[in-house]
Regions:
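Residue-level recognition of phosphate/Mg2+-coordinating polar/acidic sites
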Residues: 23, 48-66, 112, 123-127, ...
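A conserved short coil-to-beta-strand element within the FAD-binding core of flavoproteins
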Residues: 95-109
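Residues at the starts of beta-strands that form the adenosine-phosphate
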Residues: 14, 92, 152
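Glycine-rich FAD pyrophosphate-binding loop
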Residues: 7-32
Length: 302
């Protein structure tokens, strides 16, 4: 896409793409579970993005959640459209050409390819992706090269990932609950999402967890442990019930010790009963504000 845009802006430019892998768009071909989630109607400037893809011949459809996919729901079609556009514009692609390093001279850039080739260019555009999913070729090469050329690089952390927790909740592994989840930093609300949370052996996962994970930012120079401890994740298992304590009080008259039955999954029910004892107010608080402490983001490969 970067090469196509550059060529469209300057039709006389001679452009070559150095592709690390032997095939084009391997990571793009795997996005959206192979369907290629191009954009979302909730994203800013999504219409501009769609116009770009329309210009490449990609017709899209939007699902009920606002996610935008190619009508074929095949990410490889998007890859093919990009390759065809490069062919049409006369953009050369050199495959299996991982860049080892780049040197900046007065007149140009000297780009060294691992297998021994060297290319000189007056301009260099680094569009090497991030660091997530190394099996698709993205291992942080772009930031490494940019840093070698004098650019400042902020700390790289995974985003849109599951969250590891300080609390030991392995006994809840496999439990899924639709709920409202919120991220807090030193008592300040940062982000709120609604969706399904999945408890795992290490912490929590699910799309709503991925969405809040990108807001967990540890500043440069701050140790990760102390940085994570400033955040809290709160889960409201019953966001549709405002007066939960009153509801539980009424249920306790009819159901006695079984007043939590049918509200959440059994494993979670047993845990809340164990921690709250017969204190209905405490049980209500746990259901409305189940508070957790992140200790890490899951990582680049998850």
């Amino acid at each position: 896409m970067a090469a196509i845009t550059a060529k469209q802006k300057n039709k006389d430019a001679k452009i070559i793409v150095l592709e690390k892998l032997g095939v084009p768009g391997k990571k793009l071909g795997a996005t959206g579970n192979g369907k290629c989630n191009i954009s979302n109607i909730k994203c800013e400037h999504h219409e501009a993005v769609l116009n770009v893809f329309k210009g490449l011949g990609i017709i899209t459809r939007t699902d009920k959640a606002g996610r935008i996919y190619p009508c074929s729901e095949d990410a490889k079609d998007v890859v093919r459209a990009l390759v065809l556009s490069m062919d049409r514009l006369g953009i050369r692609v050199k495959y299996s050409s991982p860049v080892s390093h780049v040197e900046k001279n007065k007149e140009d850039f000297e780009i060294y390819i691992e297998k021994g080739d060297r290319i000189k260019s007056k301009s260099l555009l680094i569009a090497a992706g991030g660091k997530a999913g190394s099996k698709f070729g993205t291992t942080g090469d772009g930031t490494r090269i940019a840093k070698s050329l004098g650019h400042s690089i902020t700390r790289l952390v995974p985003s849109l990932t599951a969250v590891e927790l300080k609390e030991e909740l392995g006994f809840l592994a496999g439990v899924r609950e639709k709920c409202e989840i919120s991220l807090w930093y030193e008592e300040k609300l940062i982000r709120k999402e609604y969706g399904e949370v999945q408890f795992t052996g290490y912490g929590i996962s699910g799309i709503c967890v991925f969405n809040i994970s990108k807001y967990i930012v540890i500043p440069e120079g701050v140790p990760l442990k102390s940085g994570f401890e400033k955040y809290r994740i709160k889960i409201d298992f019953l966001p549709e019930i405002d007066n939960l304590e009153e509801v539980l009080e009424n249920r306790s008259f009819k159901l006695q010790d079984n007043y939590l039955i049918s509200l959440v999954k059994r494993a979670l029910t047993e845990y809340i009963k164990e921690k709250s004892g017969k204190d209905i107010s405490k049980a209500a608080k746990m259901l409305k504000s189940f508070t957790l402490t992140p200790k890490n983001l899951r990582g680049w490969e998850f």
